[in-house]
């Protein structure tokens, strides 16, 4: 989860999020090198008299500043496309979870099981237990197994919403009349928090998401208690 005055991303808890962090660092380093070069050239122009007022043509320079940006864009595009394909690829899922957005709560349905569905509202501050987070805790957590591919089917009953878990690298819009799909696979157990990330009305800020990722054995025990 995020902490006050935190500048970086949340700790990655899925292979996709790890790839996104690597891509962020890769792109940031390229931006840093370009910015350093531009600042160096600006400082050089301000502190020296290396100007060529009589130069009318410089094909070598024009060739360099055409090819170099193209190479840089390719270096950014290739890993970006790789991650996009990874996020879109869904192998045979072990579990399917259907998520519906409402004003202003989420409803979940485990489509592989009969009658396993529930609504998830933000827990009011008066009901919070010690250690639970204000505005982020819910009355019904989503429990899922770790280290297994899970297919998320996401839609909305009313307006646009967005189902987002930053530490898992998942952000999918919930659009009325459309069923969007996402992949989720957690690499370690834990409790992961998210929120609706699309302004959806007066109580948009009060649509938290809580995932409880547990080992498969504990997930099976939870299933038996719910069915």
UniProtKB/Swiss-Prot annotation:
InterPro entries: CcO_II, CcO_II-like_C, CcO_II_C, Copper_CuA, Cupredoxin, Cyt_c_oxidase_su2, Cyt_c_oxidase_su2_TM_dom, Cyt_c_oxidase_su2_TM_sf
Annotated positions binding Cu cation A2: 196, 198, 200, 204
Mitochondrial intermembrane side: 1-14, 88-227
Pfam families per the UniProt record, alphabetical: COX2, COX2_TM
Predominant subcellular localization, coarse grouping: mitochondrion
Gene3D superfamilies documented for this protein: 1.10.287.90, Cupredoxins - blue copper proteins (2.60.40.420)
Keywords: Copper, Electron transport, Magnesium, Membrane, Metal-binding, Mitochondrion, Mitochondrion inner membrane, Respiratory chain, Translocase, Transmembrane, Transmembrane helix, Transport
Compartment(s) where it occurs, according to its Swiss-Prot or TrEMBL record: Mitochondrion inner membrane
Reactions this protein catalyses: 4 Fe(II)-[cytochrome c] + O2 + 8 H(+)(in) = 4 Fe(III)-[cytochrome c] + 2 H2O + 4 H(+)(out)
Positions with a binding annotation for Cu cation A1: 161, 196, 200, 207
Residue numbers binding Mg(2+): 198
Gene Ontology terms, MF aspect: copper ion binding; cytochrome-c oxidase activity
The record's free-text note on cofactor binding: Binds a dinuclear copper A center per subunit.
EC top class, as a word: translocase
Function comment: Component of the cytochrome c oxidase, the last enzyme in the mitochondrial electron transport chain which drives oxidative phosphorylation. The respiratory chain contains 3 multisubunit complexes succinate dehydrogenase (complex II, CII), ubiquinol-cytochrome c oxidoreductase (cytochrome b-c1 complex, complex III, CIII) and cytochrome c oxidase (complex IV, CIV), that cooperate to transfer electrons derived from NADH and succinate to molecular oxygen, creating an electrochemical gradient over the inner membrane that drives transmembrane transport and the ATP synthase.
Protein name per its UniProtKB record: Cytochrome c oxidase subunit 2
């Amino acid at each position: 989860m995020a902490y006050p005055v935190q500048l970086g991303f949340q700790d990655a808890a899925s292979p996709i999020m790890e790839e996104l962090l690597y891509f962020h660092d890769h792109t940031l380093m390229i931006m840093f090198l370009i910015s350093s070069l531009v600042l160096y050239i600006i400082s050089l122009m301000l502190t020296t008299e290396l100007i060529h007022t009589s130069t009318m043509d410089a094909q070598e320079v024009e060739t360099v500043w055409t090819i170099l940006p193209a190479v840089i864009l390719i270096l950014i595009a290739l890993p970006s496309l790789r991650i996009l394909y990874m996020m879109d690829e869904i192998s045979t899922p072990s579990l399917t979870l259907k998520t519906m957005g409402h004003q202003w709560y989420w409803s979940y349905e485990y489509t592989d099981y009969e009658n396993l569905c529930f609504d998830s509202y933000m827990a009011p501050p008066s009901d919070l237990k010690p250690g639970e987070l204000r505005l982020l805790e819910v009355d019904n957590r989503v429990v899922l197994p770790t280290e297994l591919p899970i297919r998320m089917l996401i839609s909305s009953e009313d307006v646009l919403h967005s189902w987002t878990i930053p530490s898992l690298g998942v952000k999918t819009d919930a659009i009325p009349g459309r069923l969007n799909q996402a992949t989720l696979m957690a690499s370690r157990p834990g409790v992961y928090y998210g929120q609706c990330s699309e302004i959806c009305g007066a109580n948009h800020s009060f649509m938290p998401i809580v995932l409880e990722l547990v080992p498969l054995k504990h997930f099976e025990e939870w299933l038996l208690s719910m069915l």
